[in-house]
């Protein structure tokens, strides 16, 4: 079930505060990387153009936010598991 429209998208308060402060900054060229543990935060239009490092449980994955990302969650772009592939050929040798 999706989130109610009247509630609006969820964005961590601390993350939202950092984004708003950086948008208000006079020098837009010095956009620093924002670190966030909040994988469940929804990407909103104010975040476009920022690089947000999302923690995957082990390391920080930098995610550059573009317009296509709006509406998705931050956790979708930092995988937590590594798929190493299936085992090699398991063909039976002669019968």
From Swiss-Prot:
It comes from the Bacteria. One of its GO terms (biological process) is translation. The keyword ATP-binding does not apply. GO terms for molecular function: rRNA binding; structural constituent of ribosome. Pfam families: Ribosomal_S19. One of its GO terms (cellular component) is small ribosomal subunit. Keywords: Ribonucleoprotein, Ribosomal protein, RNA-binding, rRNA-binding. Protein S19 forms a complex with S13 that binds strongly to the 16S ribosomal RNA. NCBIfam families: rpsS_bact (TIGR01050). Belongs to the universal ribosomal protein uS19 family. This is Small ribosomal subunit protein uS19.
């Amino acid at each position: 079930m999706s989130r109610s429209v009247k509630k609006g998208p969820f964005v961590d308060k601390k993350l939202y505060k950092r984004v708003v402060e950086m948008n208000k900054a006079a020098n837009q060229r010095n956009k620093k990387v924002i670190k966030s543990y909040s994988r469940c935060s929804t990407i909103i239009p104010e975040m476009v153009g920022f690089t947000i490092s999302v923690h995957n449980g082990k390391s920080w994955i930098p995610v550059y936010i573009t317009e296509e990302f709006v509406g998705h969650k931050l956790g979708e772009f930092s995988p937590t598991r590594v798929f190493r592939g299936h085992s090699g050929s398991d063909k039976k040798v002669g019968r």
